[in-house]
Design a protein with these regions (language model features):
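Metallo-beta-lactamase
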Residues: 30-32, 37-38, 115-122, 126-206, ...
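Short acidic, hydrophobic short linear motifs in intrinsically disordered regions
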Residues: 216-233
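Hydrophobic/aromatic beta-strand patches that form the interior of the parallel beta-sheet core
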Residues: 5-7, 58, 82, 101-103, ...
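Conserved beta-strand hairpin/beta-sheet module of binuclear metal-dependent hydrolase folds
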Residues: 1-51, 130-142, 147
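Active-site HxH/HxHxD metal-binding segment of metal-dependent hydrolases
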Residues: 13, 18, 37-115
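Conserved small/polar residues in nucleotide/adenosyl-binding loops
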Residues: 246-247
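Short helix-to-turn junction characteristic of helix-turn-helix DNA-binding domains
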Residues: 211-215
Length: 248
């Protein structure tokens, strides 16, 4: 774990859990991944921790809790930003992020200390990327996989089919643990992926069953039926994923 330093942003909430995780990779040639929200104290902490060794900024996706700090840090340190733009519209888009380097699936970012492989994982967002630290078999997952919570897949940019496909895609990589965008490091990656896929498919089957059994068409009522195992105060969030299941 010497190559990885985690800094958690002070933005706890229903969507973000304990806060957004920012990662510094390397010892001398540092890569900053997901600088997080544009919060001054968080940006200051990142710059202090980087000790003038940050050479590039990578973003897993451009939601407002992951990328807004990229531009101010890039300007201060005079380093390039790497990532992708969304394919269309997004409900939570950070409009300040425009990558200097556009990343594509299977791209490699090589330094003398480590190699990062880019894995395009659309689903949570069309431009979502994961980054595999080859020397550690550690996957920086962003919001593709989170600790302690399932991922919200919401319209218009989210796509449940793409999300399942992107989860299955990870089986071909050698991964020993996850460094998620929210929460703690996660071991047993294969079992974690299998569990998420089972959960999503089970939820989809439940949607079909509830639609057939109830005949209900009201979105709020259907969400309550499908997510009756989830605390009611989270139904407003669950509704985003339900919209995609309902219309798929």
């Amino acid at each position: 774990m010497e190559l990885i330093k985690k800094i958690t942003a002070p933005n706890p909430g229903v969507f973000t859990g304990g806060g957004t995780n920012t990662y510094l990779i390397g010892k001398e040639d540092l890569t900053l991944i997901d600088p997080g929200p544009n919060i001054e104290e968080h940006i200051d902490e990142i710059i202090r921790a980087g000790k003038n060794k940050i050479k590039r900024i990578l973003v897993t996706h451009t939601h407002t809790d992951h990328s807004p700090a990229a531009l101010p840090i890039s300007k201060v340190l005079k380093v390039p930003m790497y990532g992708r733009l969304v394919d269309g519209e997004s409900a939570w888009e950070d409009e300040t992020f425009i990558p200097d380097v556009v990343l594509n699936d299977a791209d490699l970012i090589k330094t003398d200390e480590y190699t990062l492989e880019v894995i395009h994982t659309p689903g949570h967002a069309s431009n979502h990327l994961c980054f595999l630290i080859k020397e550690l078999n550690c996957l920086i997952t962003g919001d593709h996989i989170m600790d302690g919570s399932t991922v919200v897949i919401g319209p218009p940019d989210g796509n449940m089919r793409s999300y399942i496909d992107s989860l299955n895609k990870l089986f071909k990589y050698k991964i020993d643990y996850f460094a998620p965008g929210h929460g703690n490091f996660m071991h047993l990656p294969k079992k974690t992926i299998e569990s998420i896929i089972r959960h999503r498919l089970s939820r989809e089957a439940k949607v079909i069953r509830k639609l057939e059994d109830s005949g209900e068409t009201n979105l709020e009522a259907l969400t309550a039926l499908v997510y009756d195992d989830v605390s009611e105060h989270l139904h407003s969030i669950a509704k985003f994923s339900f919209c995609l299941l309902y219309t798929s």
